[in-house]
């Protein structure tokens, strides 16, 4: 069977949070359209049928392979949570905003949010791609409260065209997060591995508690922890084909946890903050 597209239109604007974790290509695969309309969705903790919240258009039966299923939310809402939960294949498109936990525990496939999304986008994901055209909330690609470092994102790619809240990449182990705009405090806190690239500014203390991985700040930084030591200057940096062609100062840390994480901070955007560090390290042929 060829690929199939299912379009979902919200009947009314949601007043409470909707748990949409059952709306995935994996759940749709191999089911009749009549079965899909009866999928259970939680509306404010109350069980309801998918057809009570959405009008559904699509073929009479979904392909048995989730990779051939595309789900399009024709109307988005910041109340739609858990979109793409544990999906392994296929594609989800949200034509608008999305709520918390988009792509939570995602294992593959792709999610595109054409608006903004709330907290925990891609939290604990293992593979796949998430692209958000707008901004995202806190802990994109992160772990949950109380979990140990390394329990966050374990693979895949998250691209955010707008800004991100605090603690982007919190506790991540692998994978790549690219933020085109700015980010809040504690980018890459408790990281074990992976990469977080913030092309714009970030808040206080990027990399706090990190023991591995890489954080890149292409704009201004609020402050750097004293438990990071300046290592060297580099003329530019590339991450997954994205090249930031300007000088960066490389810091190593967080030594409080015996960390060997890499923190790259744009020199030109932080001359006042970094001039002292520059005097402590040996330049490697970079004019600054």
For each feature predicted by the language model, list its residue ranges.
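Intrinsically disordered, low-complexity linker/loop segments enriched in Gly/Pro
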Residues: 93-102, 112-121, 133-144
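LRR N-terminal entry segment and analogous cap-like coil->beta motifs
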Residues: 75, 89-90, 94
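Metabolite-binding pocket within alpha/beta catalytic cores that recognizes anionic/polar moieties
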Residues: 79, 83-86, 98, 102-105
């Amino acid at each position: 069977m060829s690929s199939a597209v299912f379009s979902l239109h919200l009947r009314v604007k949601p007043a409470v949070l909707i748990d949409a974790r059952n709306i995935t290509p994996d759940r749709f695969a191999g089911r009749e359209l009549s079965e899909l309309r009866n999928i259970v969705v939680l509306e404010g903790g109350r069980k309801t049928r998918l057809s009570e919240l959405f009008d559904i258009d699509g073929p009479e039966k979904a392909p048995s392979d989730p990779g051939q299923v595309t789900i399009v939310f024709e109307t988005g809402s910041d109340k739609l949570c858990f979109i793409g939960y544990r999906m392994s294949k296929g594609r989800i498109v949200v034509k608008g905003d999305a709520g918390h936990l988009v792509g939570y525990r995602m294992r593959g496939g792709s999610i595109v949010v054409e608006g903004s999304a709330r907290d925990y986008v891609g939290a604990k994901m293992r593979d796949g791609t998430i692209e958000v055209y707008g901004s995202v909330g806190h802990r994109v690609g992160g772990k949950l409260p109380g979990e140990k470092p390394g329990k966050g994102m374990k693979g895949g790619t998250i691209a955010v065209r707008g800004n991100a809240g605090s603690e982007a990449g919190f506790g991540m182990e692998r994978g790549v997060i690219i933020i085109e705009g700015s980010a809040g405090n504690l980018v890459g806190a408790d990281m074990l591995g992976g990469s977080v690239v913030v092309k714009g500014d970030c808040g206080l203390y990027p990399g706090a508690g990190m023991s591995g991985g890489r954080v890149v700040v292409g704009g201004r930084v609020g402050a750097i922890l004293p438990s990071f030591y300046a290592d060297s200057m580099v003329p530019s940096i590339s991450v997954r084909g994205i090249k930031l062609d300007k000088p960066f100062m490389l810091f190593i840390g967080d030594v409080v946890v015996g960390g060997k994480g890499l923190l790259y901070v744009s020199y030109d955007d932080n001359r006042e903050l970094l001039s002292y560090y520059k005097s402590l390290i040996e330049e490697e042929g970079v004019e600054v």
